[in-house]
Amino acid sequence: LHTLFTLEHNAICDRIRGVYSSWSDERVYQTAKLINSALMAKIHTVEWTTAILPNKVLQTGMSANWWGLAGQPVRTTWGRISKSEAISGIPGSERHHHGAPFALTEEFVTVYRLHPLIPDEVRVQAARDGSVIKDVDFKQLALRNAVSFFDEVPIVDAMYTMGVEHPGAMVLHNYPNFLRNLTLPDGEILDMAAVDILKDRERGIPRYNQFRRLLHMRPFKTFEQITPNRSWSAKLKEVYEGDIERIDPLVGMLSETPPAGFGFSDTAFRIFILMASRRIKSDRFFTDDYNPRVYTPEGMRWIAENDMSAVLLRHYPELAPALRGVTNAFAPWNRLPIGRKVARAPGHREVLAERRSTAGPVDSQVAP
C-alpha cells in the first residue's frame, strides 16, 4: 500500500503540475500530499470500514459521515447544501474538538489491535491467470523479508493475492503464530499477543467489564455470558482464576460474538465509530480548510471521483478482470480464471470465522 499510494501521489503531482506550471516543486508536493491524504481518509471511511462491518445501517452512517444524508450524488454535484454535517457530511463543515484537543485515544489503540486478521500462511497467486506461484509463511512478507519477497514476486501479483485471500477472524485462538515469536531486525524476540495485553495494562486501560461500563454497555456477570463457546468460557475462568473483572479488554473483545456481519466485537465498535467521526471533525484539513482554495479545484475533483478500485487500476491495470463487477475493493475479488476454485493454503479455511491458529491471547505469556 505504501508503494501504491506513492504512485498515486506522483500521479496527483502530474495533474497539479499540468494545471499550475508556475508552482514550485515544494508547493506541488505538499498540495498533492493533502489530496492523497484526503483520498485515503475517504477510502477508509466509506470503503474499508463498510467492508469489515457490512451492515446496512452502518454503511448508511459511514456514507453520511463523508457525504451526509443528502447522499453522494448531491454532494458530488452541488457540494455542501447545508451547514449541518448530518445533511452534508463532516468534510467541509466547521472544525470542532468537542471540549478536548484531538488525539488518538488509548482506548482507540486498544480496539484497533487487529492482528488476528493477519493469516499465518498466504497462497501467492498470479494476477494474469490466478495460477499459484507459491505458498509462503506470512513472516516471509514481514519486516526486512519483504524486500527479498518483492524481488521474486511482482507487486501486481501481491495485490491480486491480497484481493482474493481472506483475512483471519477476530476471535480467540487465532492470533498469528509468527507474531507470537517475532524476531526484530536487531535480534529481539517479541510475543506481540503478550505485548498487546501488557501495553493496555501499562496505559491504564480499564479491564473488559469496566471498559463496557464506561461505554454504558451491560457488563457480563458470568464467563458463560461472554461467549457461547463453553471451551472458551472455561479457559477464561481458569486463566483469570474465576474473577470476571480481571479479563483484559483485548481478550474479552475477542471472546464476544460480534453482531451479524461485523468483523469485530460490538464493544470495539463503540470506540471505533466515535473516533471515525472525531478524527475527521477535529482536523482542519477535513473541515475549515477542506475547500478548493487549499486543495485546488482539481484536487477536490480527484478526491470526489476516485476510490480504491480507481487507484488500483490506475497503477496496475492488469487487475481489471479481478475487480470487474466488484463494488468495494476491500470485498473479495474475482478469482481468475472466473469461477475457478483454488485449494486453500495449508491450515487456512475458506470461511473466515472457521480459521483457527493453535494459540491466542489467552495462551500468551502474560499472567492475569
Q: Where are the model-predicted features located?
A:
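Terminal regions of secretory-pathway proteins
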Residues: 13-14, 19-368
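Structured, charged N-terminal subsegments at the starts of enzyme catalytic cores
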Residues: 1-14
